[in-house]
């Protein structure tokens, strides 16, 4: 189900977590896991096993935040959510590019 990812893919997870924390979208790793509808230990288990966060989990988080964005009328909240969604989408894109290079053997 999961393939071992290079260190730079796991570094993307850490950068994303820092970005989401700075935006105030998540308060902790446990909060990130909850928002992705995963168990509390999902992030740490994946990291300790040498994997990165699953793209499907990140896509679920984008869908959830998009729903919150559509329901919100607060300009600041909407800006924060748009920034978070953009950061997650950039992470997904970067992971896909890295995975593509792995398939090509580079």
Language-model regions: role of each:
Residues 1-2, 106:
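Intrinsically disordered, low-complexity and often Lys/Arg-enriched segments
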Residues 2-24:
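A short, Lys/Arg-rich alpha-helix, primarily the initiator
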Residues 13-16, 58, 81:
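Short amphipathic alpha-helical segments that mediate assembly, nucleic-acid/protein binding
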Residues 26-28:
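Residue-level signal for the short linker/turn that defines the boundary of a DNA-recognition helix
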Residues 32-33:
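Short alpha-helical "recognition helix" segments of helix-turn-helix
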Residues 37-54:
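Recognition helix of helix-turn-helix/homeodomain-like DNA-binding domains
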Residues 56-73:
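DNA major-groove recognition helix of helix-turn-helix/homeodomain DNA-binding modules
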Residues 74-106:
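Helix-turn-helix/homeodomain-like alpha-helical modules used for DNA recognition
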